[in-house]
Amino acid sequence: METLTVGLGDRSYTIRGGSGILPGIGAFCRELGLGRIVAVVTNTTVGPLYYGPVADSLAAAGFSPLRVELPDGEEFKTSATMNIIYDALIDGGLTRDSFIVALGGGVVGDMAGFAAATYLRGIPFVQVPTTLLAQVDSSVGGKTGINHPRGKNLIGAFYQPRAVVIDVETLTTLPEREYLAGMAEVVKYGVVLDPQLFAEVERNITPILARDRDVLTRIIMACCAIKASVVEKDERESGLRAVLNYGHTLGHAVETLAGYGTFLHGEAVAIGMVQAAKLAEHRGEATADDTGRLRALLESLKLPVELPVFAAEAYREVLLRDKKARDTGLSFVLNNGIGGFSIVRLRDLSEVIDVCGIGG
């Protein structure tokens, strides 16, 4: 098992990663000094697979677990689904001494974390991500929230977990499409922050596709270390943390226009990264070889790279509603070659529309 710490003063927490560590979650939560009643928020896909061993471990450690099972899918990341969680917490008698375990992928983690942030004005929660995307990205850093029909993640809060527990064994039951979508976030870290990680993914396509546990543990914890370093410097996304939105600006637009659930989040990010690379190339911050290398890696991971066709005005409208849009324009993260980045603010989206071939 590997461990690392996200250093945020009195809100610091530990990330534990390895193979076969899920049965130890009860003892780990006991070490944290958490209250007796725990709501395990999961979904209809993950619950039948992993709620049993998690609940058994928690019960053996002296906790009283409550099962809260949600429908599975990005399309259910809504206020209506949040009320399912709130109702269960109220009916289960959870108090400020109680806590939540988020057992699932990014949607479960975002909603369970938002419930923890808002129920009784805040109770502790522990992230137990079971998808690759959640393990390398959304479970670390404290972003929680839900979607709105007019945009993704428009409602939410920054609220840090008490701990993150990553068991790569959970990836053995992950559908192929979701697993590969998670690799998009791994590639993201390499493109803008770590050229060595990018090269390692290029070298290890075969073991990655075979879900080699040792390779995955190494790559996942490397991503978590990068994410932790960024969050420590910029917890609330006022500066450096914005780099983690590489590929997300157009990616979120793709998700919104296509309808939540049409593209998996990682698939949309893969598309967005290629478009960001085109923009970087157009501005002289990357070469055609850099863009080609990124595109080839994503394609080798069986990820989409082509922007779906919607009217230019539809893209423009969704982009301007992006939560990263401010009075000074819309923030875009661009790659500087492989391993570097810059952040530009665009008042006029015509350049993006022209370079990316939007609407055509």
Swiss-Prot record:
Cofactor note from UniProt? Binds 1 divalent metal cation per subunit. Can use either Co(2+) or Zn(2+).
Main localization category: cytoplasm
| GO MF | 3-dehydroquinate synthase activity; metal ion binding; nucleotide binding
Binding-site residues, NAD(+)? 72-77, 106-110, 130-131, 143, 152, 170-173
Q: What are the binding positions for Zn(2+) in this chain?
A: 185, 248, 265
One Gene Ontology term of the biological-process aspect is: amino acid biosynthetic process
Looking up Pfam families in the UniProt record yields:
DHQ_synthase, DHQS_C
Protein location: Cytoplasm
Is Magnesium tagged as a keyword? no
Q: Which cofactor does this sequence's record say it needs?
A: Co(2+); Zn(2+); NAD(+)
Q: What class of enzyme is it?
A: lyase
Give, as in the UniProt entry, the pathway in which the protein acts: Metabolic intermediate biosynthesis; chorismate biosynthesis; chorismate from D-erythrose 4-phosphate and phosphoenolpyruvate: step 2/7
What cellular component GO annotations does this protein have? cytoplasm
Q: What is this protein called?
A: 3-dehydroquinate synthase
Species of the source: Geobacter metallireducens (strain ATCC 53774 / DSM 7210 / GS-15)
Instruction: Give the taxonomic lineage as stored in the record.
Output: Bacteria, Pseudomonadati, Thermodesulfobacteriota, Desulfuromonadia, Geobacterales
Its gene?
aroB
